[in-house]
A protein has these predicted regions:
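Double-stranded RNA-binding/processing signature
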Residues: 1-157
Length: 157
């Protein structure tokens, strides 16, 4: 098993998926952008599905929670925990300059690669674990619109 496979806990038989997921556009035309597109869609779906099934929160609150878990900032933190930055294939201009945006993009691309390699169920479990979705109740709720609506409804009935 390759080092990256061990870090991710995924054995890639088709090396092309993970190699592209770790390759920045500045390095090659065979890069992470298409996998990022796929991973972004899968993340939105699986995080939304998980929150819908595990919570009875309102649509607005669920939207805020999902936005937190798929945000560039949060995905960048999750990328750091994977400890795979040394595996990135970057153009010379980016050596030592891996931004939060790149980390988030690569995390999404890794999700796309895992999905293509292992399917939806494996990907779902990977996302639940790596995004720590089980602790969604501990995420601050900044859904001010819902809070205002509830306040108005409670006071002006």
């Amino acid at each position: 098993m390759k080092k990256i496979d061990e870090k991710l806990g995924v054995e890639f038989k088709n090396r092309k998926y993970i190699e592209e997921a770790l390759t920045h556009p500045s390095k090659s035309k065979n890069n992470y952008q298409r996998l990022e597109f796929l991973g972004d869609s899968i993340l939105d779906f699986l995080v939304g599905e998980y929150l819908f099934k595990k919570s009875d929160k309102s649509e607005g609150d669920l939207t805020v929670l999902r936005a937190h878990f798929v945000s560039e900032e949060y995905l960048s933190e999750c990328f750091d925990k994977l400890d795979v930055e040394s595996e990135l294939n970057l153009g010379k201009s980016l050596q030592g300059k891996v931004t939060r945006a790149i980390k988030g993009d690569v995390f999404e691309a890794i999700i796309g690669a895992i999905y293509l390699e292992k399917g939806i169920d494996f990907t779902r479990n990977f996302i639940i674990e790596k995004l720590n979705l089980e602790n969604f109740e501990n995420v601050e709720n900044d859904n001010y619109k819902s809070e205002l609506q509830e306040l108005v409804q409670a006071n002006f009935k």
